[in-house]
Regions:
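Extreme N-terminal tail/first-helix region
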Residues: 1-16
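Short beta-strand segments
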Residues: 15-50
Length: 124
């Protein structure tokens, strides 16, 4: 079902599986992946499982922070967005415990060191 403004706002209040489309940093072609977002204190974040190598989606956003945030649950919408990459340790330590709890993880230090983390700034 296409999203009304109220339905979109309601969908953004809770984390869920979405897709994002970034522009390939080398190819210039759109790259769409499935990922989960989190609403933490009214802000939208995307993270991932910790690992030392940076994900392609994050490298793409470092090259061009504009992307499309695709709601795809009960509400469908393609939302223009900009990524704010979060590298600063203190901010990561404030945000990632929420993600760790949602995923029932107990490796916060590894997440702070290795998990990708962006804040999603919707262009609305």
């Amino acid at each position: 079902m296409p999203g009304t403004i109220d339905a979109i706002d309601a969908a953004l209040e809770r984390g869920q599986t979405i897709d994002i489309t970034t522009m390939g940093r080398r190819s210039g072609k759109p790259r769409r992946i499935e990922i989960v977002f989190h609403n933490i204190e009214g802000r939208i974040y995307i993270s991932g499982i910790p690992r030392p190598q940076k994900r392609d989606w994050l490298l793409n956003l470092e090259a061009d922070p504009r992307f499309t945030f695709h709601l795809k649950g009960r509400t469908h919408a393609d939302l223009a967005a900009t990524a704010r990459i979060i590298d600063e340790e203190a901010e990561r330590r404030r945000i990632l415990p929420h993600v760790a709890r949602a995923w029932r993880r107990n490796d916060l230090d590894a997440m702070v060191r290795y998990s990708p983390l962006i804040e999603v700034l919707l262009d609305r």
